[in-house]
A protein has these predicted regions:
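Aromatic "clamp/platform" in nucleotide-sugar-dependent glycosyltransferases that forms part
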Residues: 279
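Short His-centered aromatic/hydrophobic patch
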Residues: 92-97
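Nucleotide-activated donor-binding/catalytic signature segment of Leloir-type glycosyltransferases, i.e.
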Residues: 242-262
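Short hydrophobic beta-strand element within catalytic cores of glycosyltransferases
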Residues: 292, 296-299
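A conserved mid-protein helix/loop that constitutes part of the nucleotide-sugar donor-binding site
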Residues: 20, 199-222
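Conserved acidic donor-binding segment of nucleotide-sugar-dependent glycosyltransferases
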Residues: 313-322, 328-333
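Membrane-proximal helix-turn-helix segments that form the acceptor-binding/catalytic region
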Residues: 79, 106, 130-147, 245
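A short, active-site helix/loop in glycosyltransferases that binds the activated sugar's phosphate group
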Residues: 141-169, 173-180
């Protein structure tokens, strides 16, 4: 079975939830016998062609542009895949690329779509962009042979919204890594940040409005705490929001840029608490990674975060900086403990990869329109 993945920026170690998802998913599917080709976006990978843990990665050109990049690349990538890759299945990631599901079907390929979240809720999009993304969602559901959804609540909403296609919409969550659950020395904490175990709060993600980092900075400044704030991540496109956010840096508010490997694991492992104040998510991999590391979490109360089913004390109203500030101030009095082993089993990447592969294989076991 030959699968071609389109919609992600690239792998490995390209910042983003979809990219993290694919980096964990596809090597496991290759080990299970699938042939996988990822068509990456040229601005995010350094080589034209390479292999990552058995996954073939091909770079196809696109303009690096906040609004046009995804749509331009998806169109080119589907044409490229049909001519040069000849896959059995196109795997589209996110509802923007899903707009082109009819094109892939027209070219004679089966299509599966992973719905990573209601992207039209992102604050950066104007009315026209939101319309296009909602249309992409519809095209993915209508023309996809199978639709994987990473959020439980979103899965149920889509089934109600598209009852004629409900049978092909399935819940397949993101996973969490056992490797984050192991011990890692605090010696791997980045020395330039001057942080020590349990003396900082952590957040991780791209510097975009829907992540709510501006709320976190405001809440942190209000809080009565001796903890530092470490923000790991950067912006794909340097804009007014990210520039304004970065100006908040001081001796206690530390922007760590992009981190990976042992540095990132150590930052997760030794944080006092991980905070995700998002306005929009699919199923946040960074929160799962924090839980995997045994670190307590504070999460905004949006549906995808609630789907994680963390303790009640872990949640605060989205956008409510006063509530978040109060939780930071009183962090030691909150009941935040979680069943780490249970979550590792529930959000297990090996099981998720096998389930994904089984669903795709089933498309060839019967006649699928």
């Amino acid at each position: 079975m030959k699968i071609c993945a389109i919609g992600l920026r690239g792998i490995p170690d390209v910042m983003g939830g979809i990219e993290s998802h694919c980096q964990q998913l596809y090597p496991r599917m290759v080990k299970n016998g699938a042939s996988v080709t990822v068509i990456a976006r040229s601005p995010y990978v350094k080589q034209k062609k390479y292999t990552f843990e058995g996954v073939n990665v091909l770079s196809v050109w696109t303009l690096k542009h906040k609004f046009l990049e995804t749509f331009m690349h998806t169109f080119f990538a589907i044409i490229y895949a049909r001519i040069f890759v000849h896959p059995d299945v196109i795997h589209l990631h996110a509802i923007g690329p899903a707009l082109f599901a009819p094109l892939a079907r027209l070219l004679g390929m089966k299509v599966v779509v992973t719905h990573h979240g209601a992207d039209y809720d992102r604050q950066k999009w104007n009315g026209f962009a939101k319309f296009i993304l909602k249309l992409g969602e519809k095209m993915g559901v209508v023309f996809g042979n199978k639709v994987f959804v990473v959020g439980k609540t979103l899965t149920e909403r889509l089934k109600q919204q598209f009852p004629d296609h409900a049978d092909k919409i399935v819940y397949v969550p993101n996973g969490m890594l056992p490797s984050f659950s192991g011990d890692i020395s605090s010696d791997y904490l980045p020395q330039e940040l001057s942080v020590s175990p349990q003396n900082y709060v952590l957040t991780v993600g791209r510097l975009v409005p829907e992540k709510g980092f501006h709320d976190l900075v405001v809440a942190y400044k209000k809080a009565n705490t001796g903890l530092k704030l470490v923000i790991v991540g950067d912006a794909d496109h340097r804009d007014e929001y990210s520039v304004t956010l970065l100006k908040q840096a001081n001796d206690d508010i530390l922007f760590a840029g992009r981190r990976g490997g042992d540095e990132l694991k150590a930052l997760f492992k030794h944080a006092k608490v991980f905070i995700l104040p998002s306005y929009h998510e699919g199923l946040p991999i960074v929160a799962l990674e924090a839980i995997s590391a045994g670190t307590n979490v504070l999460l905004s109360d949006i549906a995808p975060n609630l789907d994680i089913e963390a303790p009640t004390d872990s949640y605060f109203p989205v956008g409510d900086t006063g509530s978040l500030s109060n939780k930071i101030t009183n962090i030691d009095s909150l009941s935040l403990g979680m069943d780490q082993a249970g979550f590792l089993q529930k959000f297990n990447w090996d099981r998720i990869a096998q389930s994904t592969q089984d669903y795709i294989s089933a498309l060839f076991d019967k006649k699928v329109n």
